[in-house]
Amino acid sequence: MDKKYEKISQDLGVTLKQIDTVLSLTAEGATIPFIARYRKDMTGSLDEVAIKAIIDLDKSLTNLNDRKEAVLAKIQEQGKLTKELEEAILAAEKLADVEELYLPYKEKRRTKATIAREAGLFPLARLILQNVTDLEKEAEKFVCEGFATGKEALAGAVDILVEALSEDVTLRAMTYQEVLRHSKLTSQVKDESLDEKQVFQIYYDFSETVGTMQGYRTLALNRGEKLGVLKVGFEHATDRILAFFAARFKVKNAYIDEVVQQSVKKKVLPAIERRIRTELTEKAEEGAIQLFSDNLRNLLLVAPLKGRVVLGFDPAFRTGAKLAVVDTTGKMLTTQVIYPVKPASARQIEEAKRDLADLIGQYGVEIIAIGNGTASRESEAFVAEVLKDFPEVSYVIVNESGASVYSASELARQEFPNLTVEKRSAISIARRLQDPLAELVKIDPKSIGVGQYQHDVSQKKLSESLDFVVDTVVNQVGVNINTASPALLSHVAGLNKTISENIVKYREEEGKITSRAQIKKVPRLGAKAFEQAAGFLRIPESSNILDNTGVHPENYVAVKELFKRLDIKDLNEEAQGKLKSLSVKEMAQELDLGPETLKDIIADLLKPGRDFRDSFDAPVLRQDVLDIKDLVVGQKLEDVVRNVVDFGAFVDIGIHEDGLIHISHMSRKFIKHPSQVVSVGDLVTVWVKKIDTEREKVNLSLLAPNETD
């Protein structure tokens, strides 16, 4: 146990006490958000990411240790466990290294070498090693069933030596390091006809040293290979590797040469190549999942546009655009279908203009949220034309990824049973603008288009990572228990799908929940669930102001005492002045609270009901459409980052296609990844660097034209 903790401490830079605290709290049923928010004084203020890293690494090391014990037991049963081997297995830091050490002792299926040994050909193999002069003649003595000639007997003896040599742990380790440092991963086009859009063109004749392979390239090669477009292989310094193996023998002869050739080319290199490909893929997946997770987090934290009446506009050509107006709380007011773009007739388009204008006037629409899917560009032009008569109304292009998935889901059917899928989608688009977090949690995170190669990675690992991000953000923001959907509530610490549905049912039957104490009356919501969830649930309707803050009920008595000592009866300006000026360290001791806990309590009391998303950039509102022909090189723009990938970032600049900032145009200093400079949702100032009107591609730069670019 101590060694495991030491390893976690070394890898993650945390103390043994922090590790023990986190794992003990987890064992008691505490959730990551709860530990991060309400046990800071115990953990040394570890955040959610650090806490999860401790839990994950502990689990990984436990699995590794379990495998080591199983392998040691198997070798011990064979009576072949030496002290050196035991030490090597116990020192192994990767599961793959344990398996490499176990390989010579692993129970094997019947191989050519096994059959040869059973036929008594091992002594002949020894003769090969002794470089006996007339091996062919000696081999005649070993003719038996299955090995009818001396030549066949020698082939069997070679098989025995090949298996033994190919399982040499030291040679395999040397080969692994050689491949890692000097070999190249290559790809050639296999069937160009399967690559109609030339997506994989740069990989038609590609090579890269294994040790410097970038993750997105690994995943691209994997996808191209899977689709049958590419043939992926390795380029080795084979002669050098063969020399490693040949040096194992004191003598040389044709049979030993054959043993070396077969061991390297048929056994060891293919196995090492498989291992390297697996490790490259795992590393690439880890990077892709982390990037997707970071992008998702930033998307979920986009500032909500509260208190606005929004019209959701789901564009389409033939079937017409679906419109939905929602009030300031997200409640649907009306839906309608219009035909604003061709192939609609001129009469239909004019009618659509009147209908949209009527909706704006009738419901006091303040913002139009246009989905960025099919017919988005044409719909944007249509909306901009109508808004010439409504200077007080703006529009926003909204990323509609996943809206269709939600609108066809059981959740959407329950919410709007009498509406078509398309109208539900328009409502979702409108609500995404009002409160991105509340709406996006209804959708499988994998359907939200802010990833890179997300379909090529482990879906289980991706889901786990994205769910963690959603859980973290939901609890950091807090949830209004009286307005939240079951989907949003289910991400609150301590709550599951059943309890979340019970909360909504309780609201429907009993009316609004008016205190945190009342939450305990919800069926199936026990003491542990209440402990974990209560601090993250907000109740604006409560007579107790603490119920609408992040202050946990376990600290209400301490806060009451704090108010008494400071003579605070209301959280007015005078009270805030007292809270700001008090000595946290001294007061924490007097109240028997941890200093970090008191700091958080004061922060909540200074801004009750705060939504920290308000400090992030809001969407860019537009009133007029921009065409690629309106752009000029060197033009300055201010727009929002839509997606971040390994090679750059895509920015919504108001035309049909997002502009690309390549990583080389992000900073005058060297950066390893675009995420060091920008995040999804960031409002950035960019300059147009290159315009390709024909392909509708725009290259951007974060560097002003007068800077070194």
Segments predicted by a language model, with ranges:
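Generic start-of-chain signal for non-secretory N-termini
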Residues: 1-20, 27
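Short beta-alpha connecting loops at secondary-structure transitions
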Residues: 19, 338-343, 367, 408-421, ...
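Accessory alpha-helical DNA-binding modules that contact the DNA backbone or grooves
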Residues: 31-32, 43, 47-148, 476-615, ...
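Duplex nucleic acid-engaging cores and interfaces of nucleic-acid transaction enzymes
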Residues: 50-53, 60, 64-312, 316-418, ...
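Long, charge-rich intrinsically disordered scaffolds of nucleic-acid metabolism proteins
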Residues: 97, 396, 402, 407-477, ...
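Low-complexity, acidic/Ser/Thr- and charged residue-rich accessory regions of DNA metabolism proteins
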Residues: 138-150, 206, 245-264, 268, ...
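A glycine-rich phosphate-binding loop feature that marks nucleotide/adenosyl-phosphate handling sites
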Residues: 177-185, 313-317, 373-378, 398-405, ...
